[in-house]
């Protein structure tokens, strides 16, 4: 999901009060479904430190599963980056949810009538802006478009991700919108729409409201590492659910760009659809990278998973090792 910088962006950033903050932040992740990755297109991956590529043979036909979730050919997932002109004050929405954790056997199901639950979400913000400055739904109040839901209620929501914790250690996951509470491209600067703490082996569920764009960061322990500017510098999972600017498509990817640029640890993360397909993977220490972003691939378009308009069910494995 990469979108290359424009002269407009560079001009806007140069006009800011701290141009030095560009370093390590020239590229941040947004999403744009402008190009489809068809059969015959090139897929990039880094395996054992070697950049390789192969021809995509995925036609988009999903394997048979019990869940009535639409699947599609993965398309180009655009990602772009921008630096904040000034460091915003961190904001926290519903920082820790009280929903019970556990594993649901039917969370991948969807309502028969297509009437999705919105309980727990706040109000919706109207979309504005364009390109990398596009602002979708960030919730009213900010961050209320991302909520933890109970295992038994997960199936009622349209866009849901199942988070599977580390096998060995407690981990923390922080979620944010691309657009921060100050209205700028600052969501990852210490802000939290939702914070989850997962014990070893624990599973939790998160629902995302329509037209939401943002990311989550995950790391061992009670908090996420930050770079010298206050931005989260761990492995990210990026999302764009039901994007109005992209005609309702949804997409995701794993990114180590921020961790690499800060010279911090690269945590393992794997994001796939519920059928185990359309995966974006970074294993611990970058030992394997498949359809995911590293600093070396920051300028490559067409990385990550993408599905046509409709419900989304993702499985996120934290502390992924292979």
UniProtKB/Swiss-Prot annotation:
Region ranges (Disordered): 80-109
Pfam families, alphabetized: Allergen_Asp_f_4 (PF25312)
Biased composition (Low complexity): 80-105
Compartments, record wording: Secreted
Keywords: Allergen, Secreted, Signal
Signal peptide residue numbers: 1-20
Stretches of the chain forming a coiled coil according to its record: none
Gene Ontology cellular component list: extracellular region
GO molecular function, a single term: IgE binding
Spans traversing the lipid bilayer: none
Domain of life of the native organism: Eukaryota
The name this protein goes by in its record: Allergen Asp f 4
């Amino acid at each position: 999901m990469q979108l290359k910088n424009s002269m407009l962006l560079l001009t806007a950033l140069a006009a800011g009060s701290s141009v030095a903050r560009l370093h390590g932040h020239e590229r941040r992740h947004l999403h744009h479904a402008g190009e489809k990755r068809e059969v015959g297109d090139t897929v990039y991956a880094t395996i054992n430190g070697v950049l390789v590529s192969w021809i995509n043979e995925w036609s988009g036909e999903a394997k048979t599963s019990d869940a009535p979730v639409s699947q599609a050919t993965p398309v180009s997932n655009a990602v772009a980056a921008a630096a904040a002109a000034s460091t915003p004050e961190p904001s926290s929405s519903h920082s820790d949810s009280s929903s019970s954790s556990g594993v649901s056997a039917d969370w991948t199901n969807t309502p028969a009538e297509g009437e999705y639950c919105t309980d727990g979400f706040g109000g919706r913000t109207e979309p504005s802006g364009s390109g990398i400055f596009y602002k979708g739904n960030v919730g009213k109040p900010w961050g209320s478009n991302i909520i933890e839901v109970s295992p038994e209620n997960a199936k009622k929501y349209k866009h849901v991700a199942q988070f599977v914790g580390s096998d060995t250690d407690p981990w923390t996951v922080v979620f944010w919108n691309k657009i921060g509470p100050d209205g700028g491209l600052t969501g990852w600067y210490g802000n939290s729409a939702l914070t989850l703490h997962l014990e070893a082996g624990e599973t939790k569920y998160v629902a995302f409201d329509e037209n939401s764009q943002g990311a989550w960061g995950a790391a061992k322990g009670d908090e996420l590492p930050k770079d010298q500017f206050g931005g989260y510098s761990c492995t990210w999972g990026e999302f764009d659910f039901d994007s109005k600017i992209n005609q309702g498509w949804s997409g995701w990817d794993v990114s180590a760009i921020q961790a690499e640029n800060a010279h911090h640890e690269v945590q393992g993360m794997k994001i796939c659809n519920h059928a185990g397909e359309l995966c974006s993977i970074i294993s611990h220490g970058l030992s394997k990278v498949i359809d995911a972003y590293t600093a070396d691939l920051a300028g490559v378009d067409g990385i990550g998973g993408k599905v046509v308009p409709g419900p989304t069910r993702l499985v996120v494995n934290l502390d992924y090792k292979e």
